[in-house]
From Swiss-Prot:
Region annotation Disordered: where it falls in the sequence: 192-219
Organism: Synechococcus sp. (strain CC9311)
HAMAP family reported for this sequence: NDH1_NuoI
Cofactor(s) required, per the database record: [4Fe-4S] cluster
Cross-referenced NCBIfam families: ndhI, NuoI, PRK05888.1-3
Reactions catalysed, as given in the entry: a plastoquinone + NADH + (n+1) H(+)(in) = a plastoquinol + NAD(+) + n H(+)(out); a plastoquinone + NADPH + (n+1) H(+)(in) = a plastoquinol + NADP(+) + n H(+)(out)
A single GO BP: photosynthesis, light reaction
UniProt feature, compositional bias: Low complexity: 208-219
Its EC number(s): 7.1.1.-
SUPFAM superfamilies: 4Fe-4S ferredoxins
Subcellular location: Cellular thylakoid membrane
Protein name (record): NAD(P)H-quinone oxidoreductase subunit I
Length: 219
């Protein structure tokens, strides 16, 4: 008898524990359901990096003095500085400068310790390539200014998305009760359908008017 009661008690305790764990998991799930979406539809939508984002390194050839401080402070000795000594001026003459972004860890030490500020971090993060050798940027590629996400005409930046209120950039911590800045996808689809129907009606009127004009001219 006591063994049966013990089994019933153990079963009840396990059932209560399982229900408690299930409730805790569902509470987390329901809490996330009330939040605004964070995922963006890349590449048609892109996140706007922060002001201190450490993206692709920009290099100014004219400012570089070939001191190789960037090489010494780099954890992996990554930058390759090709220079020769000018015997007349007794100064270094820089020939080439390259950084392999397939190996770079984007720590920013080279930018921080550069004495002439010829290196800077940009907001460019799209460095994917089919060939790893193409990730080795020379001084010409490093000198190219990146296209800003906020001025890229081919994408819709996050601050203009339908998910966020006007003036908001970060999706975290935004109250779901605040009105959205843009339009919902179904609203945009309805507008496109309405514009298409209006265009079709205009084309039909033009075709009918042209047909009537042809009949009048023929008569």
């Amino acid at each position: 008898m006591f063994g049966f009661l013990k089994q019933v008690g153990d079963y009840t305790r396990d059932a209560v524990d399982a229900a408690r764990n299930l409730t805790q998991g569902l509470s987390v799930t329901f809490d996330h359901m009330k939040r605004r979406p964070v995922t963006v539809q890349y590449p048609y939508e892109k996140l706007i990096p922060s002001e201190r984002y450490r993206g692709r390194i920009h290099y100014e050839f004219d400012k570089c003095i070939a001191c190789e401080v960037c090489v010494r402070v780099c954890p992996i000795n990554l930058p390759v500085v090709d220079w020769v000594m000018n015997k007349e001026t007794k100064k270094k003459e820089l020939r080439n400068y390259s950084i392999d972004f397939g190996v770079c860890i984007f720590c920013g030490n080279c930018v921080e310790y550069c004495p002439t500020n010829c290196l800077s971090m940009t907001e460019e993060y799209e460095l994917a390539a089919f060939d790893r050798h193409s990730l080795n940027y020379d001084n010409v590629a490093l000198g190219r200014l990146p296209t800003s996400v906020t001025t890229d005409p081919s994408v819709q930046p996050l601050r203009e998305l339908v998910y966020l209120p006007a003036g908001e950039v970060q999706p975290h911590g935004v109250s779901p009760d605040r009105p959205r800045a843009g339009k919902l996808p179904e609203q945009i689809l309805e507008e496109l359908k309405a514009a298409g129907s209006m265009k079709a009606a205009e084309d039909e009127r033009e075709s009918s008017s042209s047909a009537s004009n042809m009949e009048e001219s023929a008569g």
